[in-house]
């Protein structure tokens, strides 16, 4: 199975209603659309998209799914900020019948998850806002391989023609 980690796009720094409600800024929306265009053009779209319930992650997932012509994302509470790698892999196992699953979430959760799957320690992985990482995992094994890590600038954080 391929697990695509799509970090939410650039969001507002603060929100009067708290961290949960921080929304994407236009650059963050463009990052999500760029990621969708890139994966679509490469034939690497996921079969299903799961997202954190936080506003910025849901908005990233919505922009991504709309641009890629995919069904809407499924909100998963375990993807909220503060996700534990063991919990993530346990919850993710429910989707093992899919060849390619995308999850939209947060840092440092995604870097920690990628390092845990890759068996890397010491902060060897960084997933920036709007970046895409893809890991190949063969359940029930915990370990996997990094297939690609695309920074937001290569993923297309600007619109075509800009």
Where are each of the predicted segments found?
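Active-site-proximal alpha-helix that buttresses catalytic centers in soluble enzyme cores
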Residues: 2-83, 90, 110, 123-129, ...
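Generic beta-sheet signal
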Residues: 3, 97-105
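Glycine-rich phosphate-binding loop signature in dinucleotide/nucleotide-binding domains
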Residues: 42-44, 94-99
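Short Pro/Gly-enriched beta-strand edge/turn motifs at strand-loop
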Residues: 74, 114-119
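A short acidic, often aromatic-flanked loop/helix-cap motif at beta-alpha or helix-coil junctions
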Residues: 80-84, 154-157
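Extended, charge-rich low-complexity interaction segments
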Residues: 107-116, 158-162
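Domain-level recognition of soluble alpha/beta enzyme cores
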Residues: 118-145, 151-155
């Amino acid at each position: 199975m391929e697990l695509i980690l799509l970090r939410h796009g650039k969001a507002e720094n603060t929100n009067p209603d708290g961290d949960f409600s921080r929304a994407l800024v236009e650059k963050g929306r463009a990052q999500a659309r760029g990621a969708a265009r890139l994966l679509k053009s490469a034939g690497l779209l996921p079969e299903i998209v799961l997202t954190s319930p936080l506003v910025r992650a849901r908005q990233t997932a919505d922009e991504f799914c709309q641009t890629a012509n995919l069904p809407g994302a499924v909100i998963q509470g375990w993807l909220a900020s503060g996700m534990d790698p063991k919990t993530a892999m346990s919850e993710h196992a429910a989707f093992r019948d899919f060849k390619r699953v995308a999850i939209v979430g947060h840092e440092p959760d995604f870097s920690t998850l990628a390092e845990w799957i890759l068996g890397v320690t010491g902060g060897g992985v960084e997933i920036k806002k709007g970046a895409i990482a893809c890991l190949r995992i063969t359940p029930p094994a915990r370990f996997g391989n990094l297939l690609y890590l695309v920074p937001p600038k290569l993923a297309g954080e600007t619109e075509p023609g800009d």
